[in-house]
């Protein structure tokens, strides 16, 4: 059963990471939203479904199963797409290795859907 105290701590750490990273994904560098998505999708002329993949998630740099905590130094802000794809793998790669892999794909416009690049959401 989830611990409400841990959930609250993760939420605070995610928010701190979002601010520290200037609202950009740790892996792909894409702009993200935290809280109410409507301001984000209206500002970038997106459909709500499009904005969903750019929702800020709290990414454990050291997985909880490996002893990671919800402390701010172990949480990075990652877009939902990057977080999902990292953990969909059989063995999630180390954060730095995954970031390098993602950035190479971003450079080829081969990670996010074309509209992300067209809207200028990736630096």
Label every PLM stretch briefly.
Residues 32-75, 90:
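Histidine-centered nuclease catalytic patch
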Residues 1-42:
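Short, charged surface segments at domain edges that flank catalytic/cofactor-binding sites
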Residues 75-97:
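Short Cys/His-centered divalent metal-binding micro-motifs
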Residues 1, 99-123:
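Short, intrinsically disordered terminal segments enriched in charged and Pro/Gly residues
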Residues 57-59, 87-95, 107-114:
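Short C-terminal domain-edge/linker segments immediately following a structured domain
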Residues 42-44, 95-98:
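Glycine-rich, phosphate-binding/catalytic loops in enzymes
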Residues 23-24, 57, 78:
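The −1 position to Zn-ligating cysteines in a subset of zinc-ribbon hairpins
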Residues 31, 64, 81-85:
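Cys/His-rich metal-chelating microdomains
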């Amino acid at each position: 059963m989830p611990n409400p105290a841990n959930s609250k701590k993760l939420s605070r750490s995610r928010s701190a990471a979002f601010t520290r990273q200037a609202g950009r994904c740790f892996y792909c560098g894409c702009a993200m939203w935290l809280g109410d998505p409507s301001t984000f999708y209206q500002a970038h002329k997106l459909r709500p479904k499009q904005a969903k993949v750019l929702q800020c998630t709290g990414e454990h740099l050291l997985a909880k199963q490996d002893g990671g905590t919800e402390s701010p130094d172990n949480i990075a802000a990652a877009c939902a797409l990057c977080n999902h794809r990292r953990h969909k793998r059989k063995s999630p790669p180390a954060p730095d290795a995954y970031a390098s892999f993602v950035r190479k794909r971003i450079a080829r416009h081969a990670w996010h859907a074309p509209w992300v690049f067209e809207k200028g959401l990736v630096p």
